[in-house]
Amino acid sequence: MFIDRKTELELLEQRYRSNQAELFVLYGRRRVGKTELLHAFCADKPHVFFIATLSSDSEQLATFSQQVYGFTHADVPSGFTFPSWEAALRVLGELPGQPKPIIVLDEFTYLISGNKAIPSILQKVWDEKLKNTQIMMVLCGSYIGMMETEVLGYQAPLYGRRTASTLLRPMDLASSALFFPGYSAEEKFITWAVVGGMPYYLRTFQDSQNVFSNIRQHILDAQSGTLFNEPRLLLMEELREPRNYFSILRAIAQGRTRLNEIAQGAGIGDVTTVARYLDILQQMRLITRRV
């Protein structure tokens, strides 16, 4: 069941109702609910929902090609693929314009990781063709730093093309409380304080159990706790050197807040290297610097 996100849904609906091509950028931390939001938005509209993976660029192109071809054809030939990303994106300009078709490119940063030219190719096709259609394209990504640099940044090929964007943030207390109608106000607050406003984490708790039973079962249980290994899995999925990031986060959790203290606590002698790691963690919205 999809809960809340009324403001974000209305923003998407407003752009969908426009009389022009839309290039919407949605980004935010992993587990914050971006994909579920887009599924809810697309549910009653014609759409292609492509979720990129860490597979090869040719495999990604083949999967995308088959989804696009299947949008207007009942049967997709086995092994069908467009000859290039440019060819595949240009075909989007031929899709029926009424009702407005939605093309979602989820995990867009995975596409960029596999093919650095993707933003430039999309920029070219957008300028030459797609901007004059009735299409709505949504670029969605979890690696906030890369989305800001490669999609939204001044130096990015797609700079100036987006028609709207939003950073999807964790839910506030009022929205998070909607997950637990059976909890008291105190239990709702404790749950939100422990897991934050991340829908994926909130869904692991059940209000048929008291909040402390949920914490023991889902967070503290090393054998079967759904969230016990979540920090490790997230960092391993997103970063090349997770061991150093673990050490830095552990140092911060132990109360070290100055750069040299963090470097010493993490066992990393070079403060310049630590500063770079901290910057990446800030881009991922996993830590915040307060002066």
Question: What is the predicted role of each segment?
Answer:
Residues 1-291:
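Phosphate-binding site recognition
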